[in-house]
Amino acid sequence: VERELLDAVPNITMKYDTDITPDDFGIECVKTALKTAKPSFANHKMFKKELGENYVIASCYNGLLLGGGSYTLCRLILGNIAKRAKDKKDFFENQLPYVMERMALYMDERIRFEVEESGFFESNFLAKEGFIHRDRFTAMFGMVGMAECVNILMELEGKKGRFGHDKEADDLGVEIMEAINAFNNAHVNPYCEATGGHFLLHAQVGIAQDKNITPGTRIPIGEEPKELIDQLRHCSRFHKYFPSGTGDIF
């Protein structure tokens, strides 16, 4: 039906699992996606492992707990952080830690206000009627612009390799994600108990005002590898860092 109607809405995501989803149905979904850019495909096994059976998809690929939600989504614009750095060392030791700390504190305060002062969870009809539960909420620690960040840092180090096409550049991207992941794992928020007291890392797609900022950890449009398998291999290096979702377009 969607293939014939070509509707722009609603947004549809299929929880895809090789052990559950019939191949013929999966193929029909691919054919529909090629016509309408939906459904999106969610890795059901991975989401289930990270969030449990009772997870849902919000928007196109945001994994959150059923009956919960995200207090807030803030994002690191990594390319802009790299522009502040004198070199790779300065980026890792000073610029990135500073911005992550500021963003985490900002998120903490937003969450504290929502829970302790706003009265939302006491007065909103969704909470009063049992559709949402405060103790199932978390928050999304987002990022965009990995490609620009890596390319800027490579240039600062006098190297020509580019994100998505050079092993050293891609390794640098992984190193950046390891630093972000370590910071998030060390930061505790008392109202994110549903996710172990931590925010969920999220590869954000972007907003309308973004210019020259590549979504999440994607390779910039027009610079994709010639072979699809190479792009898939590249994606696989970053997928594991984002329990609340990451996505790509092929």
Task: Name the predicted role of every residue range.
Residues 1-135, 156, 162-166, 170, ...:
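Conserved catalytic cores of very large enzyme subunits
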Residues 148, 161-162:
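Hydrophobic, structured segments
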Residues 139-152:
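Contiguous, well-ordered alpha-helical segments that form the cores/surfaces of helical PPI scaffolds
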